[in-house]
Design a protein with these regions (language model features):
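Short coil turns linking two alpha-helices in DNA-binding domains
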Residues: 34-35, 83-84
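Short hydrophobic/aromatic patch on the recognition helix
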Residues: 37-38, 42, 87-88, 92
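Basic, helix-initiating cap at the start of DNA-binding domains
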Residues: 1-5
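…primarily DNA-binding HTH/wHTH and HhH modules…
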Residues: 90-110
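Terminal helix-turn-helix DNA-binding modules in bacterial transcription factors
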Residues: 8-16, 21-25, 44-83, 105-110
Length: 110
């Protein structure tokens, strides 16, 4: 099969499972590929590792929830696949330069 098929399968798997505690191994296994080969080809295609892509996808979903819901930071953390709200908040701040609460205050539509 062509690489584009496997990449498409990976993206689909991430979109359907980002809220779970999934790993790069899970994504590669779902595609039927070796983790190292999958990671190398994914990075060639997207310019970032599967883990970086997954984290960015989760952070994007988190911004949507922060802007358009009344869920707590802890609830949003769980909703996007982080078991620890503190770990989520640190990852969010590393990604966007502000905390989830600051993001909500700045961009919330409520």
């Amino acid at each position: 099969m062509q690489l584009i098929y496997y990449i498409s399968e990976a993206i689909n798997f991430i979109e359907l499972n980002y809220q779970k505690d999934i790993t790069v191994e899970d994504i590669a296994e779902n595609c039927g590929l070796n983790r190292n080969y999958f990671g190398k080809k994914f990075k060639e295609e997207f310019g970032k590792t599967p883990q970086e892509f997954l984290m960015r996808f989760r952070m994007t979903k988190a911004t949507e929830l922060l802007e358009h819901s009344q869920l707590s930071i802890g609830e949003i953390s769980c909703a996007v696949g982080y078991n620890d709200p503190l770990h989520f908040s640190r990852a969010f701040k590393n990604t966007y330069g502000i905390s989830p609460r600051q993001w909500r205050d700045k961009y919330s539509s409520d």
